[in-house]
């Protein structure tokens, strides 16, 4: 940077000069002062026009009349006015005569004192006045002074002493490379601002010696600087009186004038007021200097009059006339910074790089400010010379910045710095849960930014994403995003470099040097969207912002024909995009590598992947800079931290990034710390590793490096004082990251983090979570490194570093424009202009209307966006590209909102406003009041780039029962609509997504709040997003491909650990929730793999407490605390497997959707008393997992819940997790939560399931009586139940059925109770769900909901299928778990797993229990309830079947669900109605049974029912089978001999091993001690989808057959649904069936359960089912039961054999499972779609396709076997031939021997 510092030869002269005015007041003129001459000439005689009554329009004097009367340009103004010095100015100043010099000096003096000085010690005589006037007239038209000067330096009070001394002082202070200590005290006193007290010790001890010049105070934006230019007219014609006022206020002691600011007659306050009044006008003039005319011309042109006119015009304009430049709408921007490009700003700021003041920046600003006691009493001791301290003051006021008042034990609040101590988060203007007050902003922001795949606002750069990259970006799902990086800088390298293009350089009179790159391309994607040609353009000016983007050829008006090989004239293209550019100045650049390389260097100037970071060591009790620098060596805590942070490297010979360290002679130390993160190299300047100088307190060798680092880490030991930047003196250190260690050098070591940054450094991520300490781990290291990298990137956006970069950029452009161009203009067609003279000028063709809407880049509109956080409107630029929607605030020039176009689900538009809904219903509102057509354009653009649609507003009416007639799940998706009800008539359809209810955004509501609003609002007005054509709900990409990090009840206090990976020591707490909004207990979050492993642990053991904790506890829908609902002392013993987590809980809960308490500890059995309402909620007891396992092992009595049941739950969870697979652990955790919640919350379950429910939800919903399913046998009126369920909209009463009776008989197993409770506890989301909570709805709902919920699956559709599969998976998982847990329970429960028969019974019967009234619909409802119960665990298979047939099918995947359902139905024989889990599975899959019920085939269910039998056999299966038998008679025709037989089989299944094969069945059966009805549900689980399909070839074959059977029956719907889910869960289910199968393990581990589960299943061999056991004579045999049992047994054997096969072929099985998993995923989308709609042909086709795939796999195996057999046959044939030959040979030999014998005998 060129220095204004005087040369050494001139300095003595200046120093020796006396002041212009002596002490006596007489002027003393020195004519040999070159600088004085120069400044006078520039200023036109320092006060020439002071006395003029009316100044000339733009004369020198008039410029200074009021703001700086008679005062010479001084200080930075004098230095910057024309910087660098221009030759013309120098010459002119040289030519000025001594007389002019003298007179100007006198003029200056007289102007200060000429008015009758009131209080001044000197007055001018008439001669002096005449001289002043003469000088004014003489120099009136001289070169005008630079108008871009700070008023502070033109005010008399700014110069208490001689102007000459002040000028000399200014000259000394160039780039700040001269230290203050070089000045004598007098000089400083003279030049120091009047607002500061002078001090004797002016010097700078610390800090960088190169503070950067800059315009305006730190942190000011350009438009802020313009605000002072408004009132220029008022300052145009000052009178002598006014001037005298100014002179009086500013007397200077040091000179001969009595104008001392402090001691003058006018108070300091008045001085301050006057000072403020003068600052703004001057700044306005400075702006006018950079008007429309070229600055180069202004500086070099002698035509002052012409310049004066242009300046006058600009001065007369108001600030409002200067508006940001708007790019033509046809231009599609490539990145965010291109949208921010402002041509008007470039014009006005073009020369700001030259007119910069030195400022005190970084930590030095705080250091100086800390020494100031008040705005008028700054101490000069530590201030920078001439203006640095002034710059610290805000523009409009001298008041000092006070900081942000944020402090903690790590950092103190400090002036000019902003602190981040945790919880700040990212600014959000959209309406979402995170900013709706549901939970603290810090937590939401923290987990959003750290764990979600959302790109932070500061991380958005490139907006145009190529089609091939439209897949989910890996970078977006990384934990920490690098921010503030101009990735668009690669635009030239990517699209121009080494491709055919044109470069044009030139010097525009307004813009200065410019460089333009243009390329015409024909991208393939353009062929589909209209214009085949596209122009890519880069327009560069001296400003850092660059215009990058493209424009379609069809959008450009041109005289040439479009879409030709020749293309359009480039001149017309540029004139259309940048009309302000004078294209005639452009010349074609050389086509050489040097030019292209320099262009790339210019564009990528701001990209730096090598960073240096300082590390300061602060011991206990220390806080100052000297103390930290003087720590000679590092302590153990510091060493431990350094070891975590990076690698200790030897500097000598180090070849990587060295960060100015000496790698040859060790002068900067022998070692340093180096590391890499992502693409960045980081070299740390560690204070203790840099050389230590014992005799130097300042440790300059250390400060030399660390003091010049932009980012510094301050490591604090315990006991260190809070850090404050005011203790540091450096102009470069802008950001400090404070890290404090806790429990150093121990296993529990952890770190706290805080950040303090200079106020003009924008905020940066990742955000610091509030109150969180980071354990020592790679996660913390990544967090810290990302924070440091982002800090430096953000600091480069501060004024100081932008000024440096702008200067560099300008030099690059100058070099290109002057040295690398040809003489070829951009339009070289004018060789013979006379030819075209006679012809008429060609008219330009009109552009194709709306052509730009198909552009790939971002189309921009100026809008007003609503900030929901601050309840205000913002002037923003809305940019919509093919991948992003961004809102950029114009004032701060920062992105305030961004989302992916693939996340947009819909919008609501009016003539002047637009509300865009994205992701889960969050919304952002924009409006346009200028052009109503803009809203239409934005809507068209949204239609082009997104899959959303226009929303629909409707008013819903209630029926006679006050019901709205539809069910809505927790996501706001309509799960079921009552056919031909009011809602249906209004146009509401299944799959519709509610985004607003009564003007309240659904995204801000919890599910309970949503339901409450629907139930209580008098007039229900909703805004919905219509579903897709196939009735699937519109889902965002985020929902589809990544699971939400939180449960659906986000407003319930989920522990931060769940959302943040650093703290994992907190366990879930059981909190009684007093209402629907009661917080769920958060669970500790484990890594996804850990969670899966835990979940999958076999041996019936519950997962570790951490995993259990992961599942939050929900509160009952009726708002009662879960604890009250489930008391450990209840009569019913409930053993919950860790896997079951929430499922078992849900089962026990009667009407509360979220009745189960958090499953934090899955271990332990509870003895629960039936609630008066007749339902007990089984909760996970705090008991240890081991305990639970043991209890389940007991299994002898119905009381103990078989381990299989627990396994089932956990397996389902695991399966869901495994399906998520690639999704991040957050998703995984989320899914767990969902499972749990649904479990606890039947409504939640139904919430999840309804979306996926395929069965006629309307019917199921209507079946309020079905809801009665409540375990209470007593039939309570639907209304009664509805009263309990707050979530039911369709039928509120159906949601919860209460009975005064006990749910279970004493002999009923816990599992039974649980399943039944589950049914009871189910509550519909909006009422319909409640009804569906009945067997069919609940189970289906839970699974379906899970599927529909974003958490349920990686993709929207996939998610839904995932849940389906999860139901299947659950069944499988349950089985697997069962197998694992079976270790103990399996033996007893294996028979239970055969509850298929009972399942069929329950299904067949309307499932009317003795005391409860159930219709088939009820049964369906009951099943749904069960499933709802299940839904708590994502895999709820219970569902109600309308027809007994459905229930009969044992193969249905809902068998797992049946385990639950069976438990409920088996609780009492008379209570024949139990929700069918099979039905649930169906619903999960998305199939709905016309009957409204779901097939449930669960051997386990049947067994469980049998267990409730009076004959409780030691084995649970026996008991279950008995129960089933008893129930079967009661059940409707559905309960048939088949079911009874199945029950018997289950009861008598020979060994626990055989049970293993039916593990999933067993799981369900133990739960249901009730009769056959629950069994039916289980049977559903057991259906083909569960066992057969997943078992080996035969098993698959059987399964498929079973599935077909189920489909044929009313249950087939269930089965179908199960089957669809099957594809996802298939691998899982197969493992469950073949717990012992290795292949099963592979599949199961992949999707269903954790690796441990798989291992467990492998360990446990699949026992041969053996002969079909005969029923006990005392077991009320029934032929139908026998038939059912026989069928079930057949399937069981098939499964067993299949499992055996798979055991022999573990690899192939595993691969098969993977294939199945893939298949499931592939089918997920279609399934989910079908879920939301009634069963359709498409959904069945999908199901059949899945079956076909499995059959193909079986066929493949059969072919392999056939080939093997053929080979064997060939061997046999060969052996046969060989044997024949041998036989022939033997015969021949024998013949010969015989002949020989006979011959011998004859001879003898």
Swiss-Prot record:
It comes from the Eukaryota. InterPro entries: PDZ, PDZ_sf, Rap/Ran-GAP_sf, Rap/Ran_GAP_dom, Rap1_Ran_GAP, SIPA1L_C. One of its GO terms (biological process) is regulation of GTPase activity. Residues 380-400, 1080-1093, 1186-1205, 1399-1431 have a biased composition (Polar residues). It is found in: Cytoplasm, Cytoskeleton; Postsynaptic density; Synapse, Synaptosome. The modification Phosphothreonine is found at residues 1330, 1551. Changing residue 996 to D: In a breast cancer sample; somatic mutation. Residues 27-36, 84-94, 1379-1389, 1507-1527 have a biased composition (Basic and acidic residues). Its main location: cytoplasm. The keyword Membrane does not apply. The modification Phosphoserine is found at residues 162, 187, 193, 208, 255, 288, 1078, 1087, 1116, 1127, 1149, 1170, 1181, 1255, 1270, 1326, 1349, 1366, 1390-1391, 1412, 1431, 1433, 1528, 1549, 1554, 1565, 1568, 1585, 1588, 1603, 1645, 1647, 1650, 1708, 1711, 1728-1729, 1734. Keywords: Coiled coil, Cytoplasm, Cytoskeleton, GTPase activation, Methylation, Phosphoprotein, Synapse, Synaptosome, Ubl conjugation. This is Signal-induced proliferation-associated 1-like protein 1.
